Amino acid sequence: MLVNSYELMVILRPDLNEERVSQEVTKYQEFLTNNAAEEVSVKVWGKRRLAYQIRRFNDGIYVLFNFNGEGQQIALIERDMRLNDNVMRFLSIKLTPEKPEKEKKAKAVAVEA
């Protein structure tokens, strides 16, 4: 059982009220928890300007999820987000673990030699 760290960025429609945004965030947070994700943390960044229009909107509500899990949660939550009209875009990333300083220094010395 290999546990990895993941980051999931979601952009919600800007015309959702605070209550609806809270419902969507809670829905996906519970979804992750119920599907064996650990240490789920959520940061709502709020309404931000988009780089380009998505569905004729210039703004979007950004939500960032960080969690640890085996990976089976990703396919399930992405499927649900594709079917949800309130989600305009999403991106999930597997985070690489930080290497200890000793390994970094040893690698740097090996490259120099």
From Swiss-Prot:
Q: Which PROSITE patterns match?
A: RIBOSOMAL_S6
Q: Which keywords belong to this entry?
A: Ribonucleoprotein, Ribosomal protein, RNA-binding, rRNA-binding
Any one Gene Ontology MF annotation carried by this entry is: structural constituent of ribosome
The regions listed as transmembrane in this protein's record are none
Q: What's a single GO CC term here? A: ribonucleoprotein complex
Superkingdom of this entry's organism? Bacteria
Q: Which GO terms describe its biological process?
A: translation
One family from Pfam that matches here is Ribosomal_S6
Query: What is the role of this chain?
Result: Binds together with bS18 to 16S ribosomal RNA.
What HAMAP family has UniProt attached to this entry?
Ribosomal_bS6 (MF_00360)
The family classification in the record reads: Belongs to the bacterial ribosomal protein bS6 family.
The name of this protein is Small ribosomal subunit protein bS6
Q: The organism's lineage?
A: Bacteria, Bacillati, Cyanobacteriota, Cyanophyceae, Synechococcales
